[in-house]
Structures are given as structure tokens and as C-alpha cells.
Amino acid sequence: LMPFVPNANDLAQWLAADRGRSISLGTSAWQPNERIVGLFDIHKGEKRGDWKLSFETLTTTQRTIHLKGIHNVDGNRPLQNLTYSSAKGLATQAVAMAKVFSKRGTSIAVAQTIPDAWSIARKVAAELEPFVQVHEDIKLVQRFLAAEISEDFELIDMLSKGVVVHHAGLPAEALSLIEWLTEAGHIRVMCATTTIAQGLNFPVSSVFLATRKLPYGNEMSHRAFWNLAGRAGRIGHDSVGVIGIAAGAQPNEIRKYVSDATASLVSRLEGMLDDLQAAGELANLSWVMQQEQWADFRSYIAHLWNEKRNLDAVIGEAEQLLRNTYGFGSLRAKADKASQEKADALLEATKGYVRKLAEHPENASLADVTGFSPEGVRSTLLDMNNLENKLTLADWEPSSLFGDKSKSVLPSLMGIMLRVPQLQESLKEISKGQGNSHRKLADITQAWVTGSSIESIAKTYFEGDSLTDQISKACRAVYRDLANNGAWGLSALSKMPTSGLDFEAMTDEEKRRLNNLPAMLYHGVKTEEGVLMRMNSVPRSIAERAGEDFKARTEAGAENTLSPRKASEYLKSLKPDDWARLKPDNSSLSGEDYLKVWKRLSGEA
């Protein structure tokens, strides 16, 4: 059932070797949408500074076959403010196409990076008039952005023209509300990054890509491209979707990319072995396996070891255990000598690694619990053991960890996380810039958990050419990197034998407080009741106050334990006046606004 994967039979055999069968839908004319896929290009006009766009159709469906060929798009200068020289950028051409096609419904322009997405959003917003009457839904989202991010946030004014951005530099709640506005038909042009391809389902009429390259230069897979193409003209949304890629300097490459509509699903494991064989390094696999790109495989073997905990059993069953991976199974299924050599090398290297794990089985057990590789576990244990002062339960209390900076152990813990391979890449991205990296990480974490606004964090800790740039960096750092990897790291470190924590000797209340630490970091609040509010989709700006009120009401009742179910019941009971009583004094959202936003975010609307 995976579209655009021709080797379905291989997958079926891997998933169920004894009874796997692929099912072909090839006799059916079914498609997720009626669409035209092509490439667009810029052409110099007759007068100085003039330019125009063309669209060349590359693939059509039965109902759109009459649209084959090359078509002019919207006459001279689709973006009137730009001359030919300033419109030559591929992202600018993409947003010019999106502006033209926005007359048919929401159109998406896809840029390579977050700054590019903002840049083209500014260009198209400068060309559009504000709505004669801005819809109340848009005004609500504008007030939300002012309250939760900044009153000076650039997106607020863009919304008045039906222009939005969609990327990792926005909070998840803001993205959710932007998607809601799109579904409701209030958005003309969306300027996004390629993350837009990840499972979104809002109706758009067209999608235009500046490039098929992802932010770090890798080519977008065919599956990702066709998934993105599937956003346009979905059945029940719009009749015909238009998808275009900028021709750029190598239009023939685009033509080939689109014509190669499918690509076999290839195991990452098999790909790494191919590279080793090509480099003549297959015999050194046991040594190469210690490198970072093999961390996921090492963690998988550690998991297998942890399940058996018997050296002879794991080595004896290694072949069968490896067959459970798609890569090894694919190699064994091939008759050629090269494939068998790769499979044999992997089997022997795996057995060698299992013997190594057996020397320190506790590392494999902790790898299974924490998600770190066994080597990451070992270095973390040593780092925590080498701290100047041994950790105690008091150090892990939220009031201590996120409190007085001079006494908190958080900088030390962040320093340890920065040396864990699974965490370090994204955390180092946050801590770039002047000063001590682990101190900066700890300061941002403390500011986030103790209630500092995104605007304040952006201005204090992130450099940029504009407030928008600073806010984008802060949102990406906090909502994507810190909330995920920081929370993961904090949870993992608390489970280490050298953490100074003895969960067996703790009271239930102490355990609960400690187990809530990662959630506090994830949600940006400092109390258990605040976490419960955020888990139930309460905006961060009001979560702590609502949590205090919830706790007071619960403790006054007969059964005074806090729980997600009780939090949900409490929130459903609140009236607009209650939200108004709890809201921050300086918030641009009214009590009625908070209620509407909460209902929308929680799915209660």
C-alpha cells in the first residue's frame, strides 16, 4: 500500500517471509488527486527590467492531458515590485507562481531554508492588498501570536493579507492554528520549507518548489516529492492540483527527476555496506561499526542482547536475528557473491560486537532504557561520576535544577549531554555563539521553564538580522531541539546509576516530581499542575495560572490527586469569565479568546 515503491514484494517478504504477498493496485486508475506536474522558468521581457514566467507540463492525468505543453503564466512581471534581476532567485520564482495560482485557492511556495521562506513571504505580502474585512478567525490567531510570541512578530501583519509561513521556526501550536486557517480557506499563499511534506492534510490548489534539495543539500526522495505533490488538488478539495519545480540552470535534471516517478525502498544498512565494499573497507567492519553512522545499528544489537542476556544464545541466533532487519534479509535473498560477502561480514562483525557487550552487560541494559548507544551510556556514566560534587536528590528537585543559577547542576548536566552522540548535534546548534556552550544551554532552559517569553529568550540568547530572525532561531531551538533532545537527555541522565537518585527509596510524590522534569522542559512550565495544563493544550502564557487554580480546586475536593483526566474535566468546566480571571494582565487575548484557542488546539471545537 506504499505508493511509488516498486519493490513491494521485497517488503512483503521481509515483513512476513512465510506468507508475505504484495497487492497490486495497478489495474485501477485510482490516484489521490487530479494533478499536473511540471517545471517553471523565468524569461527576460522586452522592456528593461521586465520578466515573465512559463510552465512546462511534464506529467498529466487522463483528465488533464489536454494541458500538455508550455504555457505562459500571468503576463508581465507577476510580482510587480521586482525587476528581472531581482526575480531570478528560484525561491522568488516559486512564490511568484504561488501568487498567480492563489486565485484558485491556497498555494504553497516551498523554499529550502527558514530565512528563504521568510524572504519570499515578505515579497509576496508586499504585492497583495490586505483583506477588505479581516476574518475573525484570522484576528484570533493574530492575537494569539501577539500573546504567545511577540506583539511585533512579522507574521501578524502578513496574516491580514492572507500570507503565512510554515516551518520549524514556529511553535507547534502556531503551526496548528495556521493549518486551521488554511483548511478554512482564509490563506492565499503559504511560504514553507520542505517539512511541509510530512503528513499534512490541508486543502491547497498548487505547490511550487524552488528546489528539490533539502536544507543540507540532500535530494528530496521521490516518495517525499510525491507525498508533497499529493497535497494539491486532493479528492474532495480541489479539482486539479498544479505542482511545479523551478527549472533553474539544469532543467533536464528536473525532467528526469519527475519521470523517475518511483524508487525502490533501499535499506540504509545495505547502503552503508555498499559504501564500505566500494572503499575496500568491508574487512574492517568491526572497527568501522564504532563510527557514529552505525550508532542506530549498535543500539539495535544492544536491544537484542538485552532481551536474551545470554552470549551463546545471541551468537547462535545472530543470523536469524539479523534476518529481521530489511537490509540483512535483502542481502541474503540475493544470489550474487558481493551480497553474500556483505552479509557474512555483517554477521561476523555483529558477533564480535555482542562479545564486547557481554563484557559490560549493564551498558546494554541502560542503552535499552535510555535510547543512547552503549558507548554513549559508558561515557555518560563516567562523566557523571567525574563531576566535582556528587549528585543528590536535592540537586534534581525542580526548584533547584531550574532555580538559582549559581547553585544549579543544570550546566553540568548540559555539558554531559553535549558529549552524548545521540544528543550533541541539535544541542550544539542551540549553543552556537559567544560564551560557554553548556552554560548558555542551561540559561535558555531555565528561562524557558520559569516562564520567560519567546521574545525575551530570542532577544537575550539569539543573534539575528531582525527580530523575526531571532524569534525563528529561538522557536526552532526551544520547540524542536531543546524540548525533544533536552527532555530526552534529562530523562536518560536521571536513570543512570551515577545520578545520585535511588528511586526505590523515594516516596511516590518524589518519584512523580522527578518523572515530571522532562515534561517541564518539554512544555516550558515549572510545576506539575502546569504540565497537566500544557498536556491538555492550554497556551503556555496562561498554563501556570490555570494550573494553580486547578490545584486549589482539586485540593479542596474529596479526592485531591492531580491527574490528566481531572485536568481535562476542569478545563471543560471553565467559562469565558474564568479564563478572563486567569489570563495575564498584559495579554492581547481575552478570556473568550483563550477559550476558543484552547478548544481549537485540544480538538474540543
Regions found by a protein language model. Name each.
Residues 3-8, 30-34, 113-117, 170-171, ...:
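Conserved nucleotide-binding/hydrolysis micro-motifs of P-loop NTPases
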Residues 19-23, 33-34, 105, 160-161, ...:
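Short glycine-/polar-rich loops that comprise or flank the Walker A/P-loop
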Residues 4-121, 164:
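Conserved interdomain linker/interface between the two RecA-like ATPase lobes of SF2 helicase motors
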Residues 241, 249-312:
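C-terminal or mid-to-C-terminal helical accessory/interaction module adjacent to the motor/catalytic core
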Residues 289-307, 313, 338-605:
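C-terminal accessory/interaction regions of large nucleic acid-associated machines
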Residues 85-189, 216-226:
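Conserved C-terminal RecA-like helicase domain
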Residues 1, 111-115, 175-212, 230:
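Beta-edge loop/turn motif
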Residues 202, 206, 212-262:
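Conserved segment of the helicase C-terminal RecA-like domain
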